[in-house]
Amino acid sequence: MRFLQVYKSSALIGLIILLASKVNLAEAKRKLVATSLVTCMENSQLSANSFDVVFNPDDRSLHYDLDMSTQIDSYIFADIDVYAYGFKIITKNVDLCSINWKQFCPVHPGNIQIDSIEYISSEYVNEIPGIAYQVPDIDAYARVKITNNVSEYLACIQIYFSNGKTVSQIGVKWATAVVAGIGLLLSAILSTFGNSTAASHISANTMSLFLYFQSVVVVAMQHVHRVPPIAAAWAENLVWSMGLIRISFMQRIFRWYVQSTGGTPSLYLTSTSMSVLAQRSWQYLMELPLIKRATNVLYGNANTLIFRGIKRLGYKMGIENTSIVCTGFTFFVLCGYVLAGFIIVFKCCVELATRLGWIQKARFWEFRKQWRMILKGALLRYIYIGFVQLTILSFWEFTERDSPAVIVIACLFILLSCGLMLWAAWRTVFFARRSVALYNNPAALLYGDEYVLHKYGFFYTMFNANHYWWNIVLLSYIFVKSLLVGFAQASGQTQVLFMFILDLFYFVAIIYYKPYLDRPTNIMNILIATVTVVNSFLFMFFSDLFNQSYKVAAIMGWIFFIMNAAFSFILLMMILAFAGMMLFSKNPDLRFKPAKDDRTSFQRNTMKPEGTVNRSVANELLALGNVAKDHDDNSDYESNDTGVNDELKQAQDETTPTTVTSSDDNKPTFSEKILSKFSRPKNENASTDALRVEAPKQQTFPHNLTNLSRENLSTLGSKPYPGHTRSQSDAHNGLINSFEEEDTSSNTDPFHDSTEGDLLDTSSSDGGFRSQNYVRDDSINSLGNNKQPLRKPPGFFDEGFM
């Protein structure tokens, strides 16, 4: 009798699945799965300890593994309602006695345990519509209300179905991760080669892409009532950006670590006695058999767990609740070691290739000399990328308390991330204010000092020089969001309301200030902020904040998926386009418009080894030396006019060693020397007479041409450009307005004070600047006539230096 009761009970469940399958879909094998049965009323007299049902429409087989308990002792009737995306599509009233299910006519109290297979009639199988097999992550469920013969409400159960088709795909996860990684790798490589404009653009766009991916995951971590399956599945594609990646052996290590450090690891993924619905987080009191899960919808017990928020994401990724924090922290540390190891190995390879003569000595010179500073800057940039991940997981660990050791690690990561970002922000503001005090432009030191640029450039190169401080606003915005997600998991409605307000304020601020380095980058980040605000608005419906019908939330779930999938595709294609332009372009800087903040005017060119001369300068000096040698050979004809020839001969004697050591390619060949001998004019006296006449009109050459600075070379014999007018600076900083005054004034290098020597001294305690003489690009000539006298920078600890 007990067996027949269980058998008929399973048949009832099979009927419910078939009714719901009218709006469901199957994968290629056309499989329908139901793994969770939850109660939808308090004190329900029918509940499930474990529930696993699989229906195969090809052979009409229904495999079920049930462990249920009931307290009903009467004749019962079932009111079955099937919902698709919140719309009721099927309603059926079933008298269990009329369908000859004797074990339900009447039902007696007890446990129901069965594992069996039943074949369903083709009448029900043929009712499944064809469109049901084409939609991924379909949102369908069945609600069964059980009453007795006097219409007394006895029990309510709700069953959620899955079809095996989903938009959460391994290929999508790898594609998004690889493209974002390519963007960061290219920006790092271009920075090493000195292509600053291209590197700044690709770095800014890739960082914005990372922050957008993380924002999608953050909004999906909110403790809302129920996330539509299509929206939850898309968020799973981007969970890798938060370090939540499942590796089986690592999960075993984390479980052992939590247990060995005083915690109790969870085993929900391997448990065979529990049913899990990945929608809501699990809380229940051990002394109560049934606990309310929401205001008016679902309930669970000690054997039926309902996850949502961070736990839901972890469960969907195959990570135990007590291993979520350990997983995120571990992948962050491992990726950091890989980054540092890559830079160190690359440096060793470059040094080895240089010593073996495989590459020229001038190649990667800046990287070889400042690789330690580049390594520090790369690690700071990496911590900046992982700031969202570290703060959210650390704050959430304080509420979960997996084990004392994990709590200590969370404290250390909070101090690490927040401390380093505060230090980078403070140093950036310090250097910018000192630059404004000295040169009336924050870009002078932020981009002119290689020490500052390599170490703290990640903090401000994405933004216009006048908005160097914007990352402080961005990090504060991220920090507040982390507080909401980490500490407010107990109240999803509180989270979504404050999250929407916060996103809205940031959206208005970024439109008002437009802080990024150029217009296209500003437009892209404004669009990202727009999508983020819309996502926050949609999750307000998922939290039942407005008490609307679930059909509204289901439609919003599809809007969330379509909008974010399309926008992610556009961003990924843009990064790939940038990568293609850089890989197939000889000069990637020409592909991008320079930022309108004069940063290129202050950035130094790629450093050269000591004792070498730029190729163009060496060619000019070689040509000047050849002319001087020709005149020296004709000195017998010009004995009365030695002024100019002495100057040129001295220039040749001083130039020849430097030219030879700087570039062997510039040395004249033997055939060129022979041709130069036979190419002299026949009337040599006439040529020397002409030279004698023109000599007084020429400028007096300095005695040491090789020691000429770039400024002296550029002004030697310079003439004003006819008809040339300078336009106003787009940055409105007043640096270009005094171009005419520069032509008549003395050539003063604003970055070098002969009375003070080096501008900055890293060995001193006055701010940690690097000792160097700044060289400014004279082709831009945008600084203007600095009327203010240079003064010694205040000390690092001097009063009032900020």
From Swiss-Prot:
It is found in: Endoplasmic reticulum membrane. Glycans are attached at residues 149, 321, 547. Residues 29-169, 222-229, 279-323, 399-405, 489-495, 547-557 are lumenal. It comes from the Eukaryota. The modification Phosphoserine is found at residues 616, 635, 779, 782. Residues 653-663, 697-717, 761-788 have a biased composition (Polar residues). The keyword Zinc does not apply. One of its GO terms (molecular function) is FAD transmembrane transporter activity. SMART domains: TRP_N. Residues 629-802 are annotated as: Disordered. InterPro entries: TRP_C, TRP_Flc/Pkd2-like, TRP_N. The keyword Metal-binding does not apply. GO terms for biological process: FAD transport; fungal-type cell wall biogenesis; sphingolipid biosynthetic process; transmembrane transport. It is a multi-pass membrane protein. Residues 191-200, 251-255, 345-377, 427-467, 517-525, 579-802 are cytoplasmic. GO terms for cellular component: endoplasmic reticulum; endoplasmic reticulum membrane; membrane; mitochondrion. Its main location: endoplasmic reticulum. Keywords: Endoplasmic reticulum, Glycoprotein, Membrane, Phosphoprotein, Signal, Transmembrane, Transmembrane helix, Transport. Residues 1-28 form the signal peptide. The chain crosses the membrane at residues 170-190, 201-221, 230-250, 256-278, 324-344, 378-398, 406-426, 468-488, 496-516, 526-546, 558-578. May be responsible for the transport of FAD into the endoplasmic reticulum lumen, where it is required for oxidative protein folding. PANTHER family: FLAVIN CARRIER PROTEIN 1-RELATED (PTHR31145:SF4), INTEGRAL MEMBRANE PROTEIN (AFU_ORTHOLOGUE AFUA_7G01610) (PTHR31145). Belongs to the transient receptor potential (TRP) ion channel family. This is Putative flavin carrier protein 3. It comes from Saccharomyces cerevisiae (strain ATCC 204508 / S288c) (Baker's yeast). The lineage of its organism: Eukaryota, Fungi, Dikarya, Ascomycota, Saccharomycotina. The gene is FLC3.
